[in-house]
Each structure stands twice: as C-alpha cells, then as structure tokens.
C-alpha cells in the first residue's frame, strides 16, 4: 500500500449517502475550517452546530493512549513523531510531556461547551522511574489534573495484578511500600477504568465497570472499554491470575445492546488493540488507498465485526498514529483512531449528537491527530507535580550507572535487531554465564521489554554520555527476575520460528540475542519458514536439536510470554537477579568516563529482504 501524503484536507468526508443515517458510525456534520498540517477529515478544532439547546450538538471527543507513565518529555527518538513535509518527504519533530499535553488539551477545549476526554489504556505500566518508582501514583495524579473522563484498561494495567489495579482506581497506600508522601494517602483515579471483557474466573463477574455514560445537558454518550483478548499472553502469569479475558467483539456488542436498552444510542468503544498504517507519518491519509485499506492489523478485523450500534473506536496498543475509516458490518465507514504513544499526540474528534434521535449523525467527520509540541507554555500544575515527585526520586534516579559513546537505540529502532537489544542480551548472558550464576551459554530478550533508548545527551546535570539509574530503569522498568533454564536444541529452534509464526504470525516479535548466537531471517518467505533452517548457530556451530543448552531469559519469556510456548519447556531452572540489576552491572563493567560503551554493530541476525 502506497504511503500517500494527504495534508490540510478541507473537503468534507461523507461517511454515508443521505442525511438520515444516524444509528451507526461516528461523528460530525459540520464543516470545520482547515487546520495545521496533519489535520484530517476536515481537521482542526472547528465546530459548527448549536452549542446550546438546539437539535444538533457538537460534542468534542479528545483522546489519547499508551502514555506509559511518561510524565517528562520522552528522550531521543522515543520523544519524536514523524510528519510529512510540503514536498512529500518526512521529518521528525519533538513531542510529548504532560506539561505540554495539559496545555494542548486545555487550549483545545476552549469554546467547546460539550467536551469529553477518553483514553484507550496502557496509561500506566512500563513507566519511567519518575512514575514507576512510585507504582504509577504520579501518573494517576497527572491524569486527574488532565480531567480525563474515562479510559479502558490495557495489558500494562495488569503488570502488578488485579489488586494493584483496584488500588489505582480506588486509592490507598501501597501494601508494601506504604505511603510515598508523608501523611498523605493516595486518592486513586477520579475517572473510571473500564474492563468489559475482564471477568473473575471464580464468579464470572466483571473485574471493573464495563461501561460509562457521559452526560451533559441531556446529551448522553456511552463508552465501552476492553483490552485485547490476548492480554494473558503478554503479561506475567501473576499479573492476570484469577482473571479471564473475553473476545473483544462479542463483549463490545453485548454491552452496546445493553446501552441501547438503557436509552443510550451514542456509543464509543475504547479498545486496547491496534493496527499499523501504511506510513509512520502521523498525518498520513490511511484512507487514500480506499476506506480501511491503509491500515492493517488486529483492529481492522475487530472494527469490521463490531456492531453498527457503535459510532467510533478509539484504539491503542500498537503505539501507532492513525485516523481512519473502516467499514462496519453494514458496510458503512466508521472512524477508528489512535494517537501514537507516550503523550506525543492527541486526537480531536467531533461527534454531532442529535437530541431527537439521541444518536450520532454520521454524515460527515471532523477528526485529526495533533502533535503535542513543546512550543507552548508548560502547565504550571504539571510542572509542580513533576518537581515534587522528582525531588523524592532524585537520590536514586541520579546515580550514575555507566557511560555511552553515542545514542544506543532500542525502542526507537525499527530494525529487527536493535543495538540496545544486543547490549541487554549480552548483559543477561554475561551476568548469568558463571557456573554458580546459572551457566548460561546464550541469552534471549523480548523486544517489547525494551522500553526506551539510551540517549547520549544529558537529561539533567549528570553530563553527556552518563547513564543514570533513572535512565536505565526507563529502558528496563519491569524488574523481571532472570531465569536460566535447560532447553533442547529442538525447542530453541522452535522458539526462533515462533517469532514469525503462531501468535506472532501477523505481528512478528524478533528476540534479541547475545553475542555468538546467529541466524538468518528471510523476509521473502512466510511464517516459520522465514527462519532459515541450518542457519542457527552458537559460536559458529550449528544448533543440535538433540543437545541441551543453558539459556538465560527474563521470567516473562521463561513462562512462554509473548507467544513463545517453546521457551516454557525449559527445565532445571535457576532464578537470578533482576534484569535491571544485570543491565546496570554490565554498564558498570564495560564503560568508564574515558572509555564509554560503543554502539554495537547489530550484526547477529542476517536479514534477507
């Protein structure tokens, strides 16, 4: 699919023939004025209908997703978005930070009497030290100040289990760490977390509220929140213990009917599952190849099956930016949006509500992703929040761990083999190679566990090239315990093939490997055949299917997480230190102020294109 730039679109996009289609789909009848580059479906913040008691009322829906506790502007490429230039080429621009997100959202709300703010999950979990050190209490506090109205849960809301998620909702001090601010009890979220497809195994009852109805002056919009059904495959077993995750489509359709029976006909689904547009530019017109043709991935199949009773889908999980239409089961285009990640974008959508039918008019759309640029004034309340928590974290966060010669990209790398992935895998292998530490011969690291880059430019007063504890924690925030297990060569080979088959067939997960472990990935082939037979070697020798190897990996992978059941077959397990501890130990052992760690060559996986 061609990545065709379409910017500053000023023509109205008609979503349905005829003005009477009001029971399905999303959004706006008013023609807004053209906005800045990146505005889509008429773009901008324009609203044209009666803001009072008239029949048609424009409701502003502001949305975002996958914040992951990034209160401060993300560093390096993790803090950038791609956009089209006038000549059709692309450029990267800095974005993100809740001080700026708050300003942008507050400015966007001005002049909009009816405005609701919603999110699609993963707002907490896998967070940088500033939030993660305090079990994400700082992020929930920031979201309260952002006036978030409602969010779905995502998979990362379950990182610390259902009990901790309940604490995020209801408040209270941490059961082991206690209260972080002396004499002040954590109040919890002012907004509801929705988890319609998450039930308790023993009772079958919903873990949290399945839906929420926003209401103002008689205007009512229902929100249904779900996370991906595959959450147990990408969260530790302890995190989802005692829970059942249901089918997204079946769940949304079930509660859409319930809302309809309650007289709520305007419905938005908050879905923590996503897709991938044909271009990584946030202002790409993903409908340019045809409605629904410029985006692929799990969300497209979900959107095609969700009941026409649902008027729009706000999505997440894949950290991608898109504002698309995907045909609903009746063949009518319906809006599907996602706002990248880490607070770098927000989506502004207009929903035109008909007071007589109580439904959303789907004759036209006005929706756009907007960059959370850093050229606006910082929100003072967010600055104070960050300063207060930074002061508490400083004694730990500012400790030097090592030195780097240049940026070492992890999350910001689009390659299968990431330079920072090599460093992490080497750290895990080296830390667990001694006989008394496990005798590891190689290490495997899941790419999703690499949450950021190591950036050479100083983030504070530590000096360029210094890696602080706060920065290493941001890269490895889960503090998973390391495991060393016996794996047969056959199961090791099977695990590599599972990178590109089975649960990972449509969204590959390429394991990062330690030095000495090599193989070839042929992307011209399909499924498991992409891992070339006979190419898998350890220190130049072909892996013997009948032989046993000692393999280091984090406990999540050792449990078969991320779609790697072959890794769960390991035996003779030894539990070592945390992944963060071995990472920091490696940085300390392999770098100094005069001899910083160089960027690895990333030449262990040969890719055939």
Question: Which residue ranges define each predicted feature?
Answer:
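Secretory targeting and sorting signals
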Residues: 1-37
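Acidic, metal/ion-coordinating pockets
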Residues: 2-3, 7, 37-41, 47-371, ...
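N-terminal low-complexity, Pro/Thr-rich disordered segments
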Residues: 15-16, 28-53, 387, 606-609
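Feature captures C-terminal
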Residues: 55-60, 64, 70, 80, ...
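Short, solvent-exposed aromatic-acidic interface loops
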Residues: 364-377, 537-540
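Short amphipathic
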Residues: 365-366, 402-404, 484-486
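Acidic, glycine-rich low-complexity/disordered segments
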Residues: 383-401
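Glycine-rich phosphate/diphosphate-binding loops and the adjacent beta-loop-alpha structural elements
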Residues: 398-417
